[in-house]
Amino acid sequence: MPENMNRHLTALEFDKILSRLAEFTACPDARELAMSLRPESNLDLVQAQMNRTRDAHMLLARFGGPSFGGLRNVNNAAARAGAGSTLSLRELLDVAEVLRTVRALAQWRSTNAGVETVLDPLFSALQPNKYLETKITSA
């Protein structure tokens, strides 16, 4: 980032704004993403992100917020399982919790499915797996 941009961000106390935003995140990965945000100059990208924010705010205002409390990064565990490795009990429980969170989020969205948003492709990408979730938690 150009030096003059850093001066402007410092003057605006941008780091404090990011810290306040990060306080509202549900998991360490989201916190890291929030802290890494930087101003964007591409108008199309800014407009797309503003539309996402608008629609997320509208859904929250109309239907309340879903729970994201069980989010954990299980990428390493998924990759190891995909390669045939055995997962630890902690990793299995983390996977089950992520599956529960995905299922709850998909259910939350289905209760307000009559409202179209630019977030719909993200919600459509969610793939709940109640069978696997139950197999892990009942073992």
Where do the protein language model's features map onto the residues?
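Conserved amphipathic alpha-helical "coupling/scaffold" segments
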Residues: M1-A139
